[in-house]
Amino acid sequence: MSTLHKVKAYFGMAPMEDYDDEYYDDRAPSRGYARPRFDDDYGRYDGRDYDDARSDSRGDLRGEPADYPPPGYRGGYADEPRFRPREFDRAEMTRPRFGSWLRNSTRGALAMDPRRMAMMFEDGHPLSKITTLRPKDYSEARTIGERFRDGSPVIMDLVSMDNADAKRLVDFAAGLAFALRGSFDKVATKVFLLSPADVDVSPEERRRIAETGFYAYQ
């Protein structure tokens, strides 16, 4: 069957029975580029070629691994030694760390220079005239005021007094110290120190008076 007759039959210009399946068996000529012809083995996977290429580039994975350099960061960090925990000296760990500090702080805060303590009660020092008074009631406030007015430091012991009278005497002594520009300090429970304006008693001296016993100052 000619090509022209096939075209006519395709468009209905010729009866269908005039051609058979030969139309489908004939192949039209290729209108594009000529396709390359391949062998029958085209597309067939061959694992040997892949293994050979992989072995050439990375070494035989089925055997011994390739000799790769150790992993590391850029800049030479891999060459630096790894961090190791510090090994402490056992003698250093067992050494008391706060003993000397406590001794020094106690010596500096609570203790006083013995020479300074001796000078406090030498003749001519204002604290050498210190007086301890133990009033029984508020009526003895006059004696406290006179001693303080004369320039003598006064230790006022109110332990034997009831709270009401002790409070009144504390108010009186505080007002007296304020009026004469002195100082009024607590050295122990219900024990107070009245210091004239020309007598400067440091906190260390007040603590020392309370520790050594104010009963010694008569």
UniProtKB/Swiss-Prot annotation:
GO terms for biological process: division septum assembly; FtsZ-dependent cytokinesis. One of its GO terms (cellular component) is cytoplasm. Residues 115-203 are annotated as: Interaction with ftsZ. InterPro entries: Cell_div_SepF (IPR023052), Cell_div_SepF/SepF-rel (IPR007561), SepF-like_sf (IPR038594). Pfam families: SepF. It is found in: Cytoplasm. Residues 36-65 have a biased composition (Basic and acidic residues). Residues 20-81 are annotated as: Disordered. It comes from the Bacteria. Inhibited by 1-{4-[2-hydroxy-3-(naphthalen-2-yloxy)propyl]-1,4-diazepan-1-yl}-3-(naphthalen-2-yloxy)propan-2-ol (also known as compound T0349); the binding of this compound blocks its interaction with FtsZ. Keywords: Cell cycle, Cell division, Cytoplasm, Septation. The keyword rRNA-binding does not apply. Cell division protein that is part of the divisome complex and is recruited early to the Z-ring. Probably stimulates Z-ring formation, perhaps through the cross-linking of FtsZ protofilaments. Its function overlaps with FtsA. Belongs to the SepF family. Homodimer. Interacts with FtsZ. This is Cell division protein SepF.
